[in-house]
């Protein structure tokens, strides 16, 4: 059996301009023996999509997510956000795009332990500097309440369960009304019940809030319930399958 990577044509995105595009994106890790983390990635993700990125360990899932989220730069190729070529931006412009266009949720919540939940959710809004203090507090409180944490806003992260902390991370990711949420193994450190709750929360972000969610996951059962699954092997896309489960 051949080990050649098949050429995969990504599904056509409905709409005018895709939210996120990758054109021939390759990321080489330099060293004595250079390593390709991802290679020749071509994809388009549109509005209101719920996308899984799957594959075995070391296949490049997180590397691809970080490139799409401007947390890393490709060695070659281009990443576009809503038609804007981020390769033509300086770091200040890319940071602004990360802050306004994207939200992030990771396997470990990265909440600041000395801050209350309210203050943690306000952090992206403070960095952007568009809202008054009272408006930031109101929005943070509304986000936490919408995720079932209205009675916990003045608690600190260590007073919550793992699933509750991930809810706070989702609220923080939504703080600046991004177009897309990028999630790296958001249920990876949770038990099955908490994993299901976080999954349903992310699905609600798509179906109720109209956002796009792209999530790296090892959980095949969760990936099967998403709109689309992008499968990686050895840093390349081997399948890009629409699940038609909207």
Which ranges hold each PLM region?
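ABC family nucleotide-binding domain
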Residues: 18-225, 229
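ABC-family P-loop ATPase nucleotide-binding domain
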Residues: 1-28, 239-246
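H-loop (His-switch) and adjacent beta-strand-loop-beta switch element
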Residues: 226-242
């Amino acid at each position: 059996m051949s080990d050649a990577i098949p050429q995969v044509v990504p599904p056509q995105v409905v709409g005018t301009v895709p939210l996120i595009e990758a054109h021939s994106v390759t990321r080489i890790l330099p060293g004595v023996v250079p390593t390709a983390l991802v290679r020749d990635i071509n994809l388009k993700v549109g509005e209101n999509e719920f996308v899984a990125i799957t594959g075995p360990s070391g296949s490049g899932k997180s590397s691809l997510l970080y490139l799409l989220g401007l947390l890393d730069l490709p060695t070659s190729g281009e990443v576009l956000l809503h038609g804007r070529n981020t390769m033509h931006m300086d770091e200040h412009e890319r940071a602004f795009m990360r802050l306004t266009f994207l939200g992030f949720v990771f396997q470990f919540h990265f909440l600041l332990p000395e801050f209350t939940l309210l203050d943690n959710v306000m952090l992206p809004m403070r960095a952007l500097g568009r809202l008054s203090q009272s408006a930031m507090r109101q929005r943070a409180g509304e986000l936490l309440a919408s995720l079932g944490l209205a009675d916990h806003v003045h608690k600190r992260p260590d007073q919550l369960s793992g699933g509750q902390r991930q809810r706070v991370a989702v609220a923080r990711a939504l703080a600046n009304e991004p177009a897309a949420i990028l999630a790296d193994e958001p249920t990876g450190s949770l038990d099955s019940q908490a994993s299901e709750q976080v999954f349903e929360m992310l699905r609600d972000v798509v179906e109720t809030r109209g956002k796009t969610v792209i999530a790296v996951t090892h959980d095949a059962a969760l990936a099967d319930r998403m709109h689309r699954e992008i499968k990686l092997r050895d840093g390349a896309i081997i399948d890009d399958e629409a699940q038609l489960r909207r």
